[in-house]
């Protein structure tokens, strides 16, 4: 069984959360839509519904075009995205701290 990220454990594995989780994890890189859908393990029809919302809310931005492929990444200038990244980091710290406490107690 594949281990879920802390983000997915807290917020569920809906297509929207899976795409956000993938983009947060790879926030320094840009990806094609196909790469994001595959990396997030989301079917294409569900992905396109999520994608429309991410574009509408300015959560993602196009970075460049290679051939016919448009590449995208998280829009880290968006205040919501900034908070989301910070929140993901805080969740990771919290869960790591809990895990360390369990190991010390054992």
Language-model-detected regions and their locations in the chain:
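Short helix-capping/hinge SLiMs at alpha-helix to coil transitions
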Residues: 24-29
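Helix-turn-helix DNA-binding helix
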Residues: 47-48
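Glycine-centered, phosphate/nucleic-acid-interacting loop/turn motifs that mediate DNA/RNA or nucleotide
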Residues: 58
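Amphipathic alpha-helical dimerization/coiled-coil segments
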Residues: 79-106
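Short, hydrophobic-biased segments on the C-terminal half of alpha helices
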Residues: 51-52
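Short, cationic-aromatic polyanion-contact patches
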Residues: 7-16, 32, 62-87
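A short acidic, leucine-rich amphipathic alpha-helix
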Residues: 35-39
